[in-house]
Curated annotation (Swiss-Prot):
Gene encoding the protein: nrfA
Protein residues bound to heme c 4: C282, C285, H286, H393
Enzyme class: oxidoreductase
Cofactor requirements of the protein: Ca(2+); heme c
GO molecular function annotations of the record: calcium ion binding; heme binding; iron ion binding; nitrite reductase (cytochrome, ammonia-forming) activity
A GO term from the CC aspect: outer membrane-bounded periplasmic space
Cited InterPro entries: Cyt_c552 (IPR003321), Cyt_c_NO2Rdtase_formate-dep (IPR017570), Multihaem_cyt_sf (IPR036280)
EC number: 1.7.2.2
Protein name as annotated: Cytochrome c-552
Lineage: Bacteria, Pseudomonadati, Pseudomonadota, Gammaproteobacteria, Enterobacterales
PROSITE patterns in the record: MULTIHEME_CYTC
Family, as annotated: Belongs to the cytochrome c-552 family.
Species of provenance: Salmonella schwarzengrund (strain CVM19633)
Annotated residues for binding of heme c 2: C160, C163, H164, H301
Leader sequence residues: 1-26
Reaction equation(s) it catalyzes: 6 Fe(III)-[cytochrome c] + NH4(+) + 2 H2O = 6 Fe(II)-[cytochrome c] + nitrite + 8 H(+)
């Protein structure tokens, strides 16, 4: 009877996301320009919400690192000249959010608060300390400066105050008190006609996840986070938006193409799929209601694979058994993967062929339409593959985007063949050996030994200073 009731509820919901280091970090002190109500220390809420806290803490069990570059060295070529060519691991548990952004080679090895390759915005999805700093300094104040400036401040892992208004009476009374703790996310939702304060419970559940599991870019001199949704959320809409403002994340060092790098667009791809269209939320599948030892229901905060809680997730709506659904999902995942690899092969050739054209004396005017095709092809490929769960969220949309990417890449290569022929080059452009991550990185000129050594020195010297300063300022528990 309970299962029938739950299915009925789901049905109706379907109808209606050491010595050389300077002392600059130790000299930083908190700014108290505004009243701050965000408490970033997650353990503060453990006594009040023990089941939720312990299940959130269990995300530390999701500790395995998967090296995406080692698995697929083509990525190194596609991201040549961009920090992702150095290091790209698949995501793991929320408990590692701060650790992973510190340890990734993409954030470099800054020695001072003004040093390093990336802006403050790169902390934005990693910690409730971000919400605290935005409240304390304002958005302009928070985004100002380099990533390293936030080191002594952003120290607590993604947690309670990222998604809940922990200072509210509702939260104190045990209610969800969901909130968009990032103002830029609130503005983005309004841009697509979904103001958070007017949204229903199911919409709010996914919108909270969509603060971070989303495509974004760094806007203006301050490198502030913005979602490119002004024209809509489809891949073509965002492409049109980026083209209109002549935005690029970087220039590929081989082809000289002004590139776009998709982030993790789960909210967009979920919205385009059957679950999103029927308002089956992120929470329904990744954070189901479960029972504690006393039989009390609570929301499981060990965010993970729905198949790990099949009876509480998939079985609420689907009549198929677990093995049958896993087979369907595996087939869709394989189809996405197979087309992904085919697109990557075309793009790898296109980047090296474009380099050959430049080397042969091609002009900007000759290369412009070709680079535009490469840009659009890789953008569509990237938006599909950067959403790791697209085979589950929107497999048809994933295949559509990859098919479009293949067409654009083929257009680029056809134009390149014609252009190269005018330069007297009619033979196939050879590729270097990129059969491993290490060989691919060498092919684009990365000195990985130096990059890794600098990172290890940073982790041994600078990060401990950050943590000491955070404890001194009461931002971390002793």
């Amino acid at each position: 009877m309970a299962r029938k009731t739950l299915r009925a509820r789901r049905f109706f919901s379907l109808i209606f996301p050491f010595f050389f280091i300077t002392s600059v970090y130790a000299e930083q002190t908190p700014v108290s320009a505004k009243t701050v109500t965000v408490e970033a220390k997650n353990e503060t809420f453990a006594p009040q919400h023990p089941d939720q806290y312990q299940s959130w803490k269990a995300t530390s069990e999701q500790s395995a690192r998967e090296d995406a570059l080692a698995e697929d060295p083509r990525l190194v070529i596609l991201w040549a000249g961009y920090p992702f060519s150095r290091d790209y691991n698949k995501p793991r548990g929320h408990a590692y959010a701060v650790t992973d952004v510190r340890e990734t080679l993409r954030t470099g090895a800054p020695k001072t608060a003004e040093d390093g390759p990336l802006p403050m915005a790169c902390w934005s999805c990693k910690s409730p300390d971000v919400a605290r700093l935005i409240q304390q300094e304002g958005e302009d104040g928070y985004f100002h400066g380099k990533w390293a400036r936030g080191g002594p401040e952003i120290v607590n892992d993604l947690g309670c105050a990222d998604c809940h208004n922990t200072a509210s009476d509702d939260f104190a009374q045990g209610k969800p008190a969901l909130t968009l703790s990032r103002p830029y996310a609130e503005r983005a939702m309004e841009a697509i006609g979904k103001p958070f304060d007017k949204a229903g419970r199911f919409d709010q559940q996914s919108m909270v996840c969509g603060q971070c599991h989303v495509e974004y870019y760094f806007d203006g001199k301050n490198k502030a986070v913005k979602f490119p949704w002004d024209e809509g959320m489809k891949v073509e809409n965002m492409e049109q938006y980026y083209d209109a403002i002549a935005f690029s994340d970087w220039t590929n060092s081989l082809s000289k193409t002004p590139m776009l790098k998709a982030q993790h667009p789960e909210y967009e791809t979920w919205s385009a799929g059957i679950h999103g269209k029927n308002n089956v939320t992120c929470i329904d599948c990744h954070m189901p209601k479960v029972q504690n030892a006393e039989g009390k229901l609570y929301t499981d905060h060990k965010i993970g694979n729905p198949f790990d809680n099949f009876a509480q997730t998939c079985a609420n709506c689907h009549t198929q058994d677990k093995a049958s659904l896993q087979k369907v999902v595996a087939e869709r995942k394989q189809a996405i993967h197979d087309l992904k690899i085919k697109v990557e092969d075309q793009l790898v050739h296109a980047h090296f062929e474009a380099k050959a054209a430049w080397d042969a004396g091609a002009t900007d005017a000759e290369m412009k339409p070709i680079l535009n095709d490469i840009r659009h092809a890789q953008w569509r490929w990237d938006l599909a593959i950067a959403s790791h769960g697209i085979h589950m969220h929107a497999p048809e949309e994933g295949l559509r985007m990859l098919g479009s990417a293949m067409d654009k890449a083929a257009d680029a290569r056809t134009k390149l063949a014609r252009l190269l022929a005018t330069k007297g080059i009619t033979h196939e452009i050879p590729l270097p050996d990129i059969s491993t991550k290490e060989k691919a990185q060498k092919a684009i000129g990365l000195n990985m030994q130096q990059i890794n050594a600098e990172k290890q020195d940073f982790l041994k010297t600078v990060v401990p200073q950050w943590e000491d300063q955070a404890r001194k300022n009461g931002l971390l528990s002793q």
